[in-house]
Amino acid sequence: VFHGAMNAWNPVIKIGEQIREALREHYPDNSKQTNIQKIQELFKMVGLDDTVADRYPHELSGGMKQRAVIALALSCDPKIIIADEPTTALDVVIQDQILNEIKKVQELLGLSLIYISHDIAVIAEMTDKIAVMYAGSIVEMGPTKKIFENPVHSYTRALLDSTPSIRGEKKKLKSLDGEPPSLINKIDGCSFAPRCPDKETSCNPTEHMRLVEIAPDHFVDICSQGKE
């Protein structure tokens, strides 16, 4: 499911024809009527009217385009859906609708979902397991509930500290000093070390990054496991 549904469609070809093109490529033996029926089923699944197939992309709202992108992603019967920031540029109400559609389709078809996002609230709602990444490397991975309740890596804690809470008194959100590293050059040791608030105490910034299991199904970068 593409990052920006606004730019995912060819502007001069109707939505239905673009989905039929994918179906023809993957299922060359399908008849035209079979493909039309498949598109109708997909549109019903994501909450779109059949008439959307005969419209051009500019005739659809942002939310409708994103629903159509989800239908396109499902058209070839995948086992895994990769959703890359699928609610970018949509208002909050439409975002919630799209997320509900993705969850509904996931449960209906029994799909695995890889959801890529910087939105902590969405990750908490949509996932069973999470992998926190920094500078292209996974620094912590495990069950969502466990990591939210007991974050171990300094970057994971910093992410959660930067998210406003609806509970308790208002307080100033924390931020990290410095900037993310350039990925052009090879990084020796821990890529988070220059910004890590624990680098002088509990971390080992010279250790090359790799995951170690600290609890059942809970993995964290070895750099954060002390100066041993």
Predicted regions and their residues:
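Interfacial catalytic loop of ABC nucleotide-binding domains
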Residues: 4, 37, 54-56, 171
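ABC-type ATPase nucleotide-binding domains, specifically the catalytic core motifs of the NBD
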Residues: 7, 13-34, 47, 142
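Signature (C-motif/LSGGQ) region and adjacent switch/coupling loops
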Residues: 12, 52-56, 169, 183
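Conserved ABC ATPase "signature" region
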Residues: 33-51, 79, 160-161
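Conserved ABC ATPase signature
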Residues: 56-60, 64
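Charged, flexible cofactor/metal-binding loops and thiol motifs
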Residues: 143-228
